[in-house]
């Protein structure tokens, strides 16, 4: 593909059979909706858009913001002419049924991170597209069955990250022309970046393997990793994943021992599945710490899942700490700067 090529050109070349035509239509519709959402976010309070509570809660119990509701309305409107069997949204208690014989179903979070709106931080839209099998309940297959996934980042630029199952491409919104243009093709997660993203304030609640990994990073050059690490935490899933795609490192949102946090807080169908598909397509890895996220199946629309994703070596290290606790280097004197061993 050529630098600056529009998203619509890519989708036109991709749409070679009925299923792919439906996928292309869905991606194009979500992209169009995201442009409208981007404009609303950019206007902020000038357009009456704030992070104020709407007065209700979504299906997952989160307090809905004004923009959550507007973003949901925009995405549903954008998808009205797309041939889908069902829609699953963070903002809905139940599936929105379409044509049961349509070739695809779509899961999405219309506005991820809406609590960041009033602080002018990054938010986004996440989506997952799966094949529909007539007679089979939608969204019951493993995440590995996804045929397309992506997310939009509403930041200094509005960017669309997309995989159609053959690598990851990044597009940026040309605001004058109101089209997405290709800026990076076949993105690969950098393999060796000394960065990790986690909410360290929850350290006391984590399982020991997560504590062990983070403690190794904190130990830096004096510890078993033999290098200093930087910690990042934005509190926005789309921003964290975009950074890892472009800079490398690892993102952790594990389960912990707080009530209601045993499986973390991220939702499988419209957060961890699509982000994991994107990450693997970019040469990274995504795990719960014990198993591959894309091997998981959802029992409910809003099922949660831990998420550890990023550079393969770091994800594998965290998995090893879960399966073999003896791999933890807690006897620091042997591994410190002046110790006998380094790993």
Swiss-Prot record:
Statement: the UniProt record of this protein carries the keyword Hydrolase: yes
Cellular component terms per the entry's GO annotation: cytosol
A single MF term (Gene Ontology): fructose 1,6-bisphosphate 1-phosphatase activity
Chief location bin: cytoplasm
Enzyme class, UniProt record, top EC level: hydrolase
Binding site for substrate: 112-115, 199
Keywords: Calvin cycle, Carbohydrate metabolism, Cytoplasm, Hydrolase, Magnesium, Metal-binding
Residues where Mg(2+) 1 binds: 90, 109, 111
Subcellular location: Cytoplasm
GO terms of biological process kind: fructose 1,6-bisphosphate metabolic process; fructose 6-phosphate metabolic process; fructose metabolic process; gluconeogenesis; reductive pentose-phosphate cycle; sucrose biosynthetic process
E.C. numbers: 3.1.3.11
Cysteine pairings via disulfide bonds: none
Record has Metal-binding as a keyword: yes
Binding site for Mg(2+) 2: 109, 112, 271
Cofactor notes: Binds 2 magnesium ions per subunit.
Catalytic function, reaction form: beta-D-fructose 1,6-bisphosphate + H2O = beta-D-fructose 6-phosphate + phosphate
Signal peptide range in chain numbering: none
Source organism superkingdom: Bacteria
Pathway assigned to this chain's UniProt record: Carbohydrate biosynthesis; Calvin cycle
Cofactor(s), names only, from the UniProt record: Mg(2+)
UniProt subunit comment: Homotetramer.
Family: Belongs to the FBPase class 1 family.
Protein name: Fructose-1,6-bisphosphatase class 1
Annotated source species: Rhodopseudomonas palustris (strain TIE-1)
């Amino acid at each position: 593909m050529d630098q600056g090529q529009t998203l619509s050109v890519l989708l036109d070349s991709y749409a070679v059979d009925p299923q792919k035509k439906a996928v292309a239509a869905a991606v194009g519709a979500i992209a169009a909706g995201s442009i409208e959402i981007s404009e609303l976010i950019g206007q902020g309070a000038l357009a009456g858009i704030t992070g104020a509570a709407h007065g209700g809660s979504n299906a997952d119990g989160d307090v809905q913001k004004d923009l959550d509701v507007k973003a949901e309305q925009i995405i549903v409107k954008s998808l009205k002419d797309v041939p889908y069997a069902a829609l699953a949204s963070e903002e809905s208690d139940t599936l929105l049924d379409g044509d049961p014989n349509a070739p695809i179903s779509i899961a999405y979070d219309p506005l991820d991170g809406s609590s960041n709106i009033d602080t002018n931080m990054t938010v986004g839209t996440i989506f997952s597209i799966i094949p529909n099998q007539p007679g089979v309940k939608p969204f019951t297959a493993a995440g590995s069955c996804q045929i397309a996934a992506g997310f939009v980042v509403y930041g200094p630029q509005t960017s669309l990250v997309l995989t159609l199952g053959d690598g990851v491409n990044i597009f940026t919104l040309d605001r004058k022309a109101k089209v997405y243009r290709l800026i990076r093709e076949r993105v690969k997660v950098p393999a060796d970046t000394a960065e990790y993203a986690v909410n360290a304030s929850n350290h006391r609640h984590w399982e020991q393997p997560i504590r062990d990994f983070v403690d190794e990073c904190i130990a830096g050059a004096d510890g078993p990793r033999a290098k200093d690490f930087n910690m990042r935490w934005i509190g926005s899933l789309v921003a964290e994943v975009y950074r890892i795609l472009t800079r490398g490192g690892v993102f952790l949102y594990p389960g912990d021992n707080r009530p209601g946090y045993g499986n973390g807080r991220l939702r499988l169908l419209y957060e961890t599945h699509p982000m994991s598909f994107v990450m693997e397509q970019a040469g990274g890895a995504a795990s719960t710490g014990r198993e591959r996220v894309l091997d998981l199946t959802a029992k409910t629309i809003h099922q949660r899942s831990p998420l550890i994703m990023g550079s393969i070596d770091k994800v594998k290290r965290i998995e090893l700490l879960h399966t073999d606790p003896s791999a933890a280097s807690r006897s620091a004197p042997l591994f410190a700067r002046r110790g006998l061993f380094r790993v």
